[in-house]
Swiss-Prot record:
It comes from Emericella nidulans (strain FGSC A4 / ATCC 38163 / CBS 112.46 / NRRL 194 / M139). Induction: Expression is induced by an intimate physical interaction of the fungal mycelia with the bacterium Streptomyces hygroscopicus. Expression is repressed by VeA and MvlA via histone 3 acetylation by the SAGA/ADA complex. Dehydrogenase; part of the gene cluster that mediates the biosynthesis of orsellinic acid, as well as of the cathepsin K inhibitors F9775 A and F9775 B. The non-reducing polyketide synthase orsA produces orsellinic acid by condensing acetyl-CoA with 3 malonyl-CoA units. Further modifications by the decarboxylase orsB and the tyrosinase-like protein orsC lead to the production of F9775 A and F9775 B. The functions of orsD and orsE remain unclear since only orsB and orsC are required to convert orsellinic acid into F9775 A and F9775 B. The keyword Nucleotide-binding applies. Substrate binds at F130, A131, V132, E133, A134, A135, V136, C137, N292, D293, I294, A295, T296. Gene3D superfamilies: Medium-chain alcohol dehydrogenases, catalytic domain, NAD(P)-binding Rossmann-like Domain. This is Dehydrogenase orsE. InterPro entries: ADH-like_C, ADH-like_N, GroES-like_sf, NAD(P)-bd_dom_sf, PKS_ER, Trans-enoyl_RdTase-like. NADP(+) binds at residues 43-46, 180-183, 203-206, 272-273, 339-340. Keywords: NADP, Nucleotide-binding, Oxidoreductase.
Length: 348
């Protein structure tokens, strides 16, 4: 008989407390995953610190799981008990504790999960789920939605990634600021698989990672001439400039983003935090909200074969913080302190 434990958040600002939790059951369109690894995202630290998106207390949060299918819902056909999977847990939308990653067993929507190839470990695979859905939300929404009150989502209306090798070039170029971050790395890979040229901005020591993800050129964010160099690279590409995805999203990066956009005649500014309140009329700015069924075809048809072929890789690589639910607090602390070109992972 399975028993469940979870790392509970009882109040904003508290450390997580490991305690018993009910073993969840899978409803229609759901699977229950027996977690072998979970990952830490910056979003999780905000949920811990200020309770953003928390709908009931105590709660279980966390977005990334990898493990084996424990149970499938009555209408689920893509998965069976024992399958190795990765999944995007969506407690931040549902508010239900059983939908949080930081537990031994988690409910995951079947349309936000994929079979993990045998050649990929759980600790590698778990870096991908949240980033996959976030990347699709950066690139493929056709109409602006609501990210939070008063802030719309971006709508770049770009096509889904393709398994074709080589993929047909789309004739478009996208700049990604923060190319070595988790979402920046995956957006680079998903965009490249859609035939979009990516020019990345990252730390000088992370150039190789951005290039592994598919960026054709990478520029140092500390270079005082980075804005002019990026503008020149876009112009030299001869491609249609789509805009910028800012995976760092600070006042300093926004200042540079807007100069780049001004010099290139405008475009989209998609960001991981609320964008500047005032932007020029030729700039369409939005904040991504990384839970959207726009990603369903990518989960259903692309993720597993793309992982098998190497079309997408589990990058940036994981750093294992520790083993057991107790280690999640340490992971959250390290995430707040800042990491570069890695994703923090806890084994269970």
């Amino acid at each position: 008989m399975a028993t469940n434990q979870a790392a509970w958040l009882t109040k904003a600002g508290n450390d997580l407390e490991v305690g018993d939790a009910p073993v969840p059951t899978a409803g229609p369109g759901e699977i229950v995953v027996k977690n072998a690894a979970v990952a830490i995202n910056p979003l999780d630290t905000h949920m811990q610190d200020v309770g953003v998106f928390v709908q009931q207390w105590p709660t279980i949060f966390g977005c990334d799981v990898a493990g084996t299918v424990h149970e499938t819902g009555p209408d689920v056909e893509r998965f069976k008990k024992g399958d190795r999977v990765i999944g995007h847990a969506i407690n931040l939308v549902t508010g239900r504790p059983q939908d949080g990653a930081y537990a031994l067993y988690t409910v995951v929507p079947a349309n936000k999960a994929a079979i993990l190839p045998d050649a990929i470990s759980f600790t590698d695979g778990v870096v991908a789920p949240f980033a996959v859905e976030a990347a699709v939300c950066v690139l493929s929404l056709k109409e602006p939605g609501v990210a939070m009150p008063g802030v719309s989502t971006p709508a770049l209306a770009l096509p889904y990634p393709s398994l074709d090798d080589p993929v047909k070039p789309l004739g478009k170029v996208l700049v990604i600021w923060g190319g070595s971050s988790s979402v920046g790395s995956m957006t680079t890979q998903i965009a490249t698989a859609a035939g979009i040229q990516v020019i990345a901005i990252s730390g000088a020591h992370n150039f190789e990672l951005s290039k592994r993800c598919g960026a054709t050129e990478v520029f140092d964010h500390k270079d005082p001439e980075v804005v002019d160099k990026v503008v020149a690279a876009v112009q030299k590409s001869g491609q249609e400039f789509v805009g910028i995805f800012d995976a760092v999203a600070t006042p300093d990066t926004y200042t540079s983003d807007l100069v780049i956009l001004e010099k290139l005649g405008g475009g989209h500014l998609a960001a991981v935090h609320p964008p500047p309140a005032e932007v020029p009329s030729n700039v369409k700015a939005g904040m991504i909200f990384a839970v959207n069924d726009i990603a369903t075809p990518v989960w259903n048809d692309f993720v597993t074969p793309a992982l098998e072929s190497g079309k997408i890789q589990c990058l940036p690589p994981p750093t294992i913080v520790g083993k057991g639910l107790e280690a999640i607090n340490e992971g959250l602390k390290r995430c707040k302190a800042g990491v570069s070109a890695t994703k923090l992972v806890v084994e269970l």
